[in-house]
């Protein structure tokens, strides 16, 4: 077993503080409209330029193992906030440092760390309740654009694109961010359900130029097994041919005689048909086929449910206004399923998302929900250089997450103003705490609430304490606009923060800072000293 180095009490806390401060100093310069960039060296390729707090935090690794523990714990604050709300990572880091630094001062002065933590937790609950009270729901396209613009570092182009995407696909829709080939940043909307499986034969294409198969007013056959023989398949094909409507077949696979028959029918100018493989794998495939069945108002023909392909009839088939199949993907537009069944399916998927503990499963469920309920929007980020594109993509990601958070829990006056407006409520709560150290813990949170505003002001070259006093003396929604160096009504000016982001930042910061304050010992491995390399033999330098 490797020997360990142990630090106790005051020495341990000093090491943690140094690690926390080192990481926070690197992250907090990015806060606010006048926040600076951080350039990160990469082992390959060009350096990364970013203003994203969590990206900066993830890159910090300190040489001193004990200091590194403090840095890693605060890194966790940024990561947890990013996971919960997708934005607000810099605010969370600033709050964590403020709570820990002030808490440490009190622990050193003799306060009980456990009581301090209890006081911090109680104060955070009061502030979170107040945040929920003062938040207002997002109602207009304009407000969504404002939230996205602020989160994208005041880039109105990005803000408007995200607002447009949200409007097109709805709050359950999926917005993905990709790198574009050119200079322009553009928005593509894929309406209806789209999955990445194309036709099984190019003979199915109806448009030779685009190489797409377009079926109008189509029937949809959904089967969860392979189709290879034509015998079982023929009865339903004859019924479809008699109906005169085109047919989309989705099955695990279609091969041999069955595929050959469909291709020959297509070449000879028979009824329009297209065959595609089912999307997904395993249990996820079955769930996606059920989604398609509900969307189109058809049935999943499955032998597990006692159904056989040979007994299938027109009533079991789904219906869609339009189906577009390319070489690589399939889009079903305006499936004619029942609205109630579709809503029930969406609610069921939402419940699964809440219950799931796996990030991968959540992501896949979210994709299914988006495809069922709204559609998919793709924002393709373009820029003149790769470095600029990556930096811009980071900002688009932040803005997208902030917008989703705003729709979920509403909006607050931005620029750190909302936390300042919670100070009177917390002051009124203090006398209710009878334990003196718990009261000190609550006062630590009280003081920390002004830290984000002070940091925004400092990054704009102003004195944070003076700006704080000015904002405190003003009415509810009035705050400091660092971009224009003016005091204004933040809601009217469109300087907004999502309530979920502010709440998550405070909760994550207080949680980790509280743990650090109650730490009394640090254990780290003693780094092994590697022997110096032997000097080169004479003549080994090859200097002829």
From Swiss-Prot:
GO terms for biological process: chaperone cofactor-dependent protein refolding; protein refolding; response to heat. Changing residue 217 to E: In strain: L2. The keyword Cytoplasm applies. Changing residue 289 to F: In strain: L2. GO terms for molecular function: ATP binding; ATP-dependent protein folding chaperone; isomerase activity; unfolded protein binding. It comes from the Bacteria. It is an enzyme of class 5 (isomerase). The keyword ATP-binding applies. ATP binds at residues 30-33, 51, 87-91, 415, 481-483, 497. One of its GO terms (cellular component) is GroEL-GroES complex. Changing residue 131 to V: In strain: L2. Changing residue 132 to K: In strain: L2. Induction: By stress. Its EC number is 5.6.1.7. Its main location: cytoplasm. Together with its co-chaperonin GroES, plays an essential role in assisting protein folding. The GroEL-GroES system forms a nano-cage that allows encapsulation of the non-native substrate proteins and provides a physical environment optimized to promote and accelerate protein folding. This is Chaperonin GroEL. It comes from Chlamydia trachomatis serovar D (strain ATCC VR-885 / DSM 19411 / UW-3/Cx). The gene is groEL.
